[in-house]
């Protein structure tokens, strides 16, 4: 093209170092801006009387420009410049408002769906008893999940208290009223009970009379969990029950005394018993012959052979 300049040494006088802005000998191709533009017309310097030439600004037809200007309250540009773009923007105005409304609706729907999924997961995992505290940013509509959780928690507490109250007269009725020495406190039976209660799933041991004592004791020994245990005696005078201590463990001093008494009484009792070992009377068993077959010799032979 006519505006393309030949390659010249890059000697510029406008730099801060004068003519030595680039070293001499380094060539730089003068850039033609026409190569990068779609318009093939060459670039010309602006005319000297630029202020007297009437010109219109080129306004790009962007999508939401008119809506943004209306929202910001800016004054619209002159109508001849905005003819095409305002027509396009007026067509696009309704879908923009619709898109904003659907954006708000989708946000609320997504938040609601998230809360429902959280509630469903907590219900499955059994975490609803502790209640659900909403996030600070949640709206008042979503705080109903907190109210639902609290209501469920209170309902469960009330039903639990009712069942406990119903259970107490039933357990009181299950204890026979003709018991001479009844325990002053209702105790729940369990497998591993501590203190006064015995681990007998059968009848109450305090109701057994002395006539059938041996028969009932054998039956309780048969059905008790940890073998025969001494029966519980209740003190009728005091309100506290006597704790079961089992067999008293002897102290080491008592053990030494008992051993000394036993040695003094019968010294032969502490001697170890004699073991009757049959003596071999010179009979030696003949050595057993190996029952080896020729194929087994391959296993016993070292690998070097």
UniProtKB/Swiss-Prot annotation:
Gene Ontology CC terms: cytoplasm
Major place of localization?
A: cytoplasm
Residues bearing PTM Phosphoserine:
182-183
Q: Which keywords, in A-to-Z order, does the entry hold?
A: Cytoplasm, NADP, Oxidoreductase, Phosphoprotein
Q: Name one GO molecular function term.
A: oxidoreductase activity
Which compartments does it reside in?
Cytoplasm
Placement of sequence motif Flavin-containing monooxygenase motif:
67-77
Phosphothreonine-modified residues are where? Answer: 44, 175
Q: How does it assemble?
A: Interacts with NELFB, NOL12 and PRNP.
Family classification: Belongs to the P33MONOX family.
The entry's protein name is Putative monooxygenase p33MONOX
Q: What is the organism of origin for this protein?
A: Pongo abelii
């Amino acid at each position: 093209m006519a505006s393309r300049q030949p390659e010249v040494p890059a000697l510029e006088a406008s730099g801060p170092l004068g003519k030595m802005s680039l070293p001499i000998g380094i060539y730089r191709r003068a850039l033609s801006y026409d190569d990068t533009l779609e318009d093939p017309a060459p670039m010309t310097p602006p005319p000297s009387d630029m202020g007297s030439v009437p010109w219109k600004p080129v306004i790009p037809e962007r999508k939401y420009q008119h809506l943004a200007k209306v929202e910001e309250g800016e004054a619209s540009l002159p109508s001849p410049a905005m003819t095409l773009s305002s027509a396009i923007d007026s067509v696009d105005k309704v879908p923009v408002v619709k898109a904003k409304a659907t954006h708000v609706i989708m946000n609320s729907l997504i938040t609601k769906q998230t809360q429902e999924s959280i509630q469903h997961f907590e219900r499955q995992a059994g975490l609803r008893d502790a209640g659900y505290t909403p996030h600070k940013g949640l709206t008042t509509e979503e705080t109903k999940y907190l109210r639902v959780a609290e209501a469920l928690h209170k309902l469960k507490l009330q039903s639990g208290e009712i069942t406990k109250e119903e259970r107490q007269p039933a357990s009181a009725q299950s204890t026979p009223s003709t018991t001479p020495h009844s325990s002053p406190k209702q105790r729940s039976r369990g497998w591993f009970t501590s203190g006064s209660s015995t681990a007998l799933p059968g009848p109450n041991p305090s109701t057994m009379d002395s006539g059938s004592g041996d028969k009932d004791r054998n039956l309780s020994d048969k059905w008790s969990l940890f073998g025969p245990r001494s029966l519980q005696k209740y003190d009728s005078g005091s309100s506290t029950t006597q704790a079961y201590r089992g067999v008293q463990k002897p102290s080491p001093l008592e053990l030494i005394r008992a051993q000394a008494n036993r040695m003094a009484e019968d010294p032969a009792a502490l001697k170890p018993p004699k073991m009757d070992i049959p003596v071999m009377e010179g009979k030696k068993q003949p050595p057993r012959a190996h029952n080896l077959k020729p194929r087994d010799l391959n296993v016993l032979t070292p690998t070097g052979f």
